Amino acid sequence: MKAEIISVGTELLLGDILNTNAQYLSKKLAELGIFLYRQTVVGDNMDRILQAFDEAFKRSELVITTGGLGPTQDDLTKEAAAKFFSKKLVLHKPTLQAIKDYFKGREEYLTEGNLKQAYIPEGAIVLDNFYGTAPGCIIEDSGKILIILPGPPKEMEPMFETAVMPYLMKLQNCVLYSKVLRVFGMGECLVVEKIKEIIENQDNPTIAPYAKEGEVLLRITARADNKELAEGMIAPIEKQIREKLGEYIYGVGEESLEEIVVNLLRKTGLTISTAESCTGGLVASKIVNVAGVSKVFMEGIIAYSNEAKVKRLGVKKETLSKFGAVSEETAIEMASGIAKSAGTDIGLSITGIAGPTGGTPEKPVGLVYLGLYVNGKTAVKKLQLGGDRNKIRNRAAMFALDFVRRALLPLV
């Protein structure tokens, strides 16, 4: 099946809005094995939308539109679709009621334009919008399929996932199953380079890398007659990827780094405490977000000043004087100090310069040291992180959790 995407909206032509819908739909169609032939952007103009429909259906059986479903006079996608297929626009009473319910208890007022949104091309399959007032619809006519979706991504994406995806899967007569591998400590470019050969040889399953907040997600998607067959197709691809990336893969699906660390602590029967400076308690906060953590996490201290490092963690004044607060030596003493003070098997420390001030040529902004104490043995990790203050702090916290994860893996 060949498909085309028509993005409707003058604001897209003018560059006022980034067309993320087309990117999203392209990836989803690829996952389904539907060949995307062309993407078109057209303004809010009846004749141009009709021309886009005519040209697209000469090339493809499936056309998906986004946008042009709003309450204003220049929102014309449904009107154009009705005219193209010689259909009437008819009132869809369940949609009308849903729109009225949407405005109950809101400061916004129901307008004539909103009522217009309840009219649907006659005979179309209505797609409910649970996040706005503009329903989508599917028109099937003489071997042609037109899927009309709202423009706002927060409305379009859930509609596609819950209604359009199952519809297209049924057309394709297949089950679509995905597995996500979570990677930390390696950038997207390097991840792609490492598994380049696997990606180049992909067909079914497909592999899609995504960078997300300091980590990389690898989505492996298979099409098959049933879930069991799809899982069997994914397994050898996952094995190849794991052989290439090793311990950089920390989890699967929705697992977070902190959940993995807490689970490893439970399996090993070890306890942990944290001593943080530049991250200001972020690591401890992430750990305690995991339910049932009280059996493995004992204590977290924010020792921001040198005085606190000496008084609360037992860092030597001589160490601070000779090497400074941001140093390997201080990080190790912080980790050892918190472990001994809290009586835990593991002590984790972070000290660094989050910026935007405080950096020097010798110790620039973004310099971070992680200290780790595990039953008498110590280790340290040096990081040089980029970005603003919040990004540095968040990335440092994630690297700290990963530092603990890697130390625990051989003990399980």
UniProtKB/Swiss-Prot annotation:
SUPFAM superfamilies noted in UniProt:
CinA-like, Molybdenum cofactor biosynthesis proteins
Q: Which Gene3D superfamilies match?
A: 3.30.70.2860, CinA-like, MoaB/Mog-like domain
List the Pfam families hit by this protein, alphabetically.
Answer: CinA, CinA_KH, MoCF_biosynth
Coiled-coil annotation: which residues? none
Q: Which InterPro entries match?
A: CinA (IPR050101), CinA-like_C (IPR036653), CinA_C (IPR008136), CinA_KH (IPR041424), Competence-induced_CinA (IPR008135), MoaB/Mog-like_dom_sf (IPR036425), MoaB/Mog_dom (IPR001453)
Source organism, top-level taxon: Bacteria
Q: Which CDD domains match?
A: cinA
Which family is this sequence assigned to?
A: Belongs to the CinA family.
User: Which HAMAP family does the UniProt entry name for this protein?
Assistant: CinA_B
| Name under which the protein is recorded | CinA-like protein
Source organism of the structure: Kosmotoga olearia (strain ATCC BAA-1733 / DSM 21960 / TBF 19.5.1)
